[in-house]
Structure formats: C-alpha cells, structure tokens
Regions:
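Phosphate/pyrophosphate-binding betaalpha-module
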Residues: 156-225, 229, 236
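Short, acidic/small-residue loops that bind anionic groups at enzyme active sites
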Residues: 177-190, 239-262, 278
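Glycine-rich anion-binding loop/nest that anchors nucleotide
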Residues: 220-239, 250-258, 288
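Glycine-rich beta-alpha loop segments
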Residues: 21-24, 28-180
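Short, solvent-exposed amphipathic alpha-helical segments in soluble enzyme
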Residues: 91-93, 174-175, 237-242, 268-271, ...
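C-terminal functional extensions of proteins
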Residues: 250, 254-302
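Solvent-exposed alpha-helices and their adjacent loops that cap or buttress functional pockets
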Residues: 66-69, 148-152, 174, 194-196, ...
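N-terminal, charge-rich interaction modules
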Residues: 2-25, 31-35
C-alpha cells in the first residue's frame, strides 16, 4: 500500500477495523479460513510462518528509522541493573533507616540478616550508579556534536531500550534534544521502553537475533559499559563479526577498565592460542566519557 494512501479508503481497512474491534470489545472475527492472511494472528504465529515474522521484524524498525533519517548510530550496551544516582541514594537511605529500626527493636536474627543484605545491595547500587552518570555524560557528548550537523551527518544514540545504562544513554542525548533509539526485547518480565527514547524510535522485538542485527545495521561505534550476560552476548557478537570481517571495522570501546579486566582475562586466550595478539586491537579500554568519544572522533576524523 502506498504510504500516502489513506487507510480509511483502502480495501485493507476492513481487515484492520475488524482486528481493532475484536481487541476493543471482543467483536467476533470471521472464521480462520476466511480471514485475510495478514489479518489472521493465529496464522502469523504458526511455526511455519516464522520466516515471515523474521522478515517483518527486520523490516519494520528499518523503515521506521530510515523514514526519520536515522542512518548512523552509536550503540551503548550495559547493565539494566545500574540505577540513576538519585534512585540509588534513595534506596540506600531507606535501607539504612530500615536496618537502624530493626536493630533498635532488637528483632530476630533472620530479620536483621535480611536488613543487612538489603543494605549491601543498596550500597552496591550506589557504587554502580557511577556508571549510569558516565553513560549519560558520554551520550551528551555525542548529541552535542551531532546537534550542530546536518541530519545526514549526525550520530544518534541507540540502546536496548531498557533501564540502567540503557536509560542513562538515552537520557543524556534526550536532555540535549537529540532523537534517541531504543531496541526493546520481549522478556518474561516485561520490559517497557524507558521514557527518554523518542516514541517513534521505540521499537520492540521478539527475536534476539533480529534485534542484534539492528544494533549492527547502523552502528558506527559500540560502547559497552559494565553488564551481565546480555551485555557480554552483544559485545562478543560484535567483536566476532569484526574479527571475521562479517562487519566493517568500527570503534569498540569497553568503558570501565577495572571491571572488564577483572571479568575477562584476554591474555589467557592469547597464551592458549585461541586468538592472536592482533585481536586485542579490536577494542579499547577507557575510563572517561571523553576518552570514549575521542576514540570515535579519531577513527572517523570528526
């Protein structure tokens, strides 16, 4: 259907209206066999139509970004569990107050142990909120640079759309008025896009594979902050794609050198011959937002 064609005068409108009515008030749908194929959710969710779903999940975010001029992104990965400093401070204050209350009441040992555990978690949140601030500052540097350029030359922050580091990066760019992209994923515990993503660039995926393809399709740089399994999965896929020349070389930045060096001993891989020393040049360690941005600027001679 032509993009400019009004849906209300299209012959496809009836199928859409039927689905809307069914969702709204339970209006009866035509029998499965009589429905138009694209308006039959049960058909589209069959195992045999998985390939079609792949295509749709590839196409929809691609068109959405192209139509809004999003062609070059800086992808920021990192933990969803690192809160904003203000949130961490509030959690710490609440945990300290709760522990003091339990100690004063001379509560049983189980309650005291729980309160101490909660305090340890709150202290960890407070410590890791540092990375939230750093991701936010980094995104501001990208947005500040891009805001002065024509649309075709701008770099846009793209994240996984969730809380924590992802929210921080979207937030930093949003605060300077720049559009930001979020590539959310459907999870058992439902993730909704953070409030700093541009609504028309807030996409949701079912398939991790398609989501990761979209991270790479427009990426001009990747900055990985400390994170867990999801961050590691995304990071190592990018490194592998560049190492094997399946993707063009691009800056890959690991923010927080102490975290990454404690987590992964790449020297072991060299010692065992599973990678070459040259492979360590595929990425950079940094500890400051400006360092990360300088690596990107140098790579592209900005």
């Amino acid at each position: 259907m032509d993009q400019s064609q009004d849906l209300s005068v299209s012959r496809l409108a009836n199928a859409w209206a039927e689905l809307q009515a069914h969702a709204r008030d339970g209006s009866a749908l035509d029998s499965d066999a009589y429905r138009l194929a694209f308006a039959d959710p049960e058909f589209l969710l069959r195992r045999e139509t998985r390939g079609i779903r792949f295509q749709l999940e590839m196409l929809k975010p691609d068109l959405g970004q192209s139509e809004q001029g999003i062609e070059s992104t800086v992808v920021v990965f990192g933990s969803a569990r690192f809160p904003a400093p203000e949130t961490a401070s509030a959690s710490l204050a609440a945990a300290e107050a709760n522990l003091a209350k339990i100690q004063a009441a001379e509560a049983d040992s189980a309650a005291l142990l729980d309160a101490k555990d909660a305090l340890m978690v709150a202290q960890r949140y407070t410590r890791n909120a540092y990375y939230y601030d750093q991701a936010r500052l980094f995104a501001r540097l990208v947005a500040e640079h891009s805001n002065a350029l024509p649309l075709a030359d701008q770099l846009f922050i793209c994240t996984g759309g969730g809380p924590g580091i992802m929210e921080a990066a979207n937030r930093g760019a949003h605060e300077l008025g720049a559009p930001t992209v979020g590539l959310n994923i459907v999870l058992p515990h439902e993730q909704s896009g953070n409030k700093y993503i541009t609504p028309s660039l807030n996409f949701k995926f079912h398939y991790f594979a398609l989501r990761k393809m979209h991270f790479m399709m427009r990426a001009k740089a990747l900055v990985a902050f400390p994170g867990g399994f999801g961050t590691l999965d995304e990071l190592f896929e990018v490194i592998t794609l560049v190492q094997t020349s399946k993707a063009k070389a691009l800056p890959i930045v690991l923010f927080g050198s102490s975290y990454w060096k404690r987590l992964i001993n790449f020297d072991v891989l060299i010692e065992e011959g599973t990678i070459s020393p040259q492979d360590l040049k595929l990425f950079h360690y940094v500890d400051e937002p400006q360092e990360a941005w300088d690596i990107i600027k140098t790579f592209y001679q900005l």
